């Protein structure tokens, strides 16, 4: 039997395809970025959020350059489809992250869509926003496979110790 690694080979593609083509992908990313700047928290599929995250971080880096920087203004003008959000980028979001280098966003997985296609969903938000905090997922470590195996081992050892104590206390009398 021969194994194929065709799924792992990207053939020069370094990004997700997300839509009907390159132009559709850019429009989708622009709309998602505009929504993120406007609301500071959005919900989308995991693939879209993961792809958009780098662009959201880079947009803040350009915003930190200031509104007098020509390249920063061009990037903001291109990526934000609603032009009333450009001042928010430079006057609200960029000063919030002025002393920070990178890691401006938080991405959390949320339950999959139920009624449609069961797509893996996520929430992305800018850190330090005024929205109520999202509940961080709590993983119950007692339910991991390793911990379940250790628990079973402990129970077996405890049971064996009880059995050995019980057998040592019962004295067998010789039969005559």
Swiss-Prot record:
Keywords: Mitochondrion, Ribonucleoprotein, Ribosomal protein, Transit peptide. GO terms for cellular component: mitochondrial large ribosomal subunit; mitochondrion. InterPro entries: Ribosomal_bL17, Ribosomal_bL17_sf. GO terms for biological process: translation. It is found in: Mitochondrion. Residues 1-8 form a transit peptide. GO terms for molecular function: protein domain specific binding; structural constituent of ribosome. Belongs to the bacterial ribosomal protein bL17 family. Component of the mitochondrial ribosome large subunit (39S) which comprises a 16S rRNA and about 50 distinct proteins. This is Large ribosomal subunit protein bL17m. The gene is Mrpl17.
């Amino acid at each position: 039997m021969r194994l194929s690694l065709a799924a792992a080979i990207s053939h020069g593609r370094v990004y997700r395809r997300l839509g009907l083509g390159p132009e559709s992908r850019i429009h989708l990313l622009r709309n998602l970025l505009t929504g993120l700047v406007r609301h500071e928290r959005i919900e989308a599929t995991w693939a879209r959020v993961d792809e958009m995250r780098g662009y959201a971080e880079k947009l803040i880096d350009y915003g930190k350059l200031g509104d007098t920087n020509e390249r920063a203004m061009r990037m903001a003008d291109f990526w934000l489809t609603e032009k009333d959000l450009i001042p928010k980028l430079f006057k609200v979001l960029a000063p919030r992250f002025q002393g920070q280098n990178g890691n401006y966003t938080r991405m959390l997985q949320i339950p999959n869509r139920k009624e449609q296609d069961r797509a893996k969903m996520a929430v992305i938000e800018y850190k330090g926003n005024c929205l109520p905090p999202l509940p961080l997922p709590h993983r119950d470590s007692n339910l991991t496979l390793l911990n379940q195996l250790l628990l079973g081992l402990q129970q077996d050892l405890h049971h064996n110790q009880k059995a050995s104590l019980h057998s040592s206390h019962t004295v067998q009398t010789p039969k005559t």
